[in-house]
Amino acid sequence: MSDTPLIQPANVGEGVYEEGREGYGHIKSYVRRAGRMSSAQENYYAEMMPKIGLVYASQPIDLAAFFGRNNPKVLEIGTGMGETTAKIADANRDIDYLGVEVHVPGVGALCKQIAERELTNLRICQHDAVEVVRDMLPEDSLDGVHVFFPDPWHKARHNKRRLIQSPFVALLASRLKPGGYFHCATDWEEYAHQMLEVLSGEPTLVNSSEGFAPRPDYRPLTKFENRGLRLGHGVWDVIFRKKQLA
């Protein structure tokens, strides 16, 4: 691994730079938003997280042992309020999904979805995604990575806080199995082009399309996406695969 931080440090006043394991740190790509869980979310959180929560630790985990089976594993970074994540897991119960989300109301909402849908193939880690990937996920352990609608940090001075940057993409690619896929989606066109450029620059990945990809059936439209499409707004999908071993 190079000495390049996983996400570039921000300027003074833009965030706190945190040292990581072995000195590889990163600037947080999110801001902890104020928000409270509803009473229902609190109840589901208290009931479900001891059962399906992955507690952060600075050591690699055995994903097959954690899920109790050796099925394909997909990491989803940023589950939001959980509806899309739960729909994907519900439609693909032969695939195990690990959702990583820092915002408590979103985690509570996803716990509710997991309980109501009786999902056994979806688990949650409430922690910073960069640290989870860096410290807990072994190399060649994932069959797929989802990064759907990450914060675009649209102001130029905040672009360095974007999640999709070359060092983090290289780290994620190292966790993918050969043939595994890396799927990003955004409704911010300038960020979409950055995603395409960054993933194209990762030597272990190859584009599955000749540019942007059509939305695959496994990614359902969100209510915000549907509204945006009705208003003529665009959404861009970027899907790469890890090169097979020679």
From Swiss-Prot:
The active site is at D151. Keywords: Methyltransferase, S-adenosyl-L-methionine, Transferase, tRNA processing. The keyword Methyltransferase applies. It catalyses: guanosine(46) in tRNA + S-adenosyl-L-methionine = N(7)-methylguanosine(46) in tRNA + S-adenosyl-L-homocysteine. GO terms for molecular function: tRNA (guanine(46)-N7)-methyltransferase activity. Its EC number is 2.1.1.33. It comes from the Bacteria. It holds the Pfam family Methyltransf_4. Residues 157-162 are annotated as: Interaction with RNA. Pathway: tRNA modification; N(7)-methylguanine-tRNA biosynthesis. It is an enzyme of class 2 (transferase). InterPro entries: SAM-dependent_MTases_sf (IPR029063), tRNA_(Gua-N-7)_MeTrfase_Trmb (IPR003358), tRNA_methyltr_TrmB_bact (IPR055361). The keyword Transferase applies. Substrate binds at K155, D187, T222, K223, F224, E225. GO terms for cellular component: tRNA methyltransferase complex. S-adenosyl-L-methionine binds at E76, E101, D128, D151. Belongs to the class I-like SAM-binding methyltransferase superfamily. TrmB family. Catalyzes the formation of N(7)-methylguanine at position 46 (m7G46) in tRNA. This is tRNA (guanine-N(7)-)-methyltransferase.
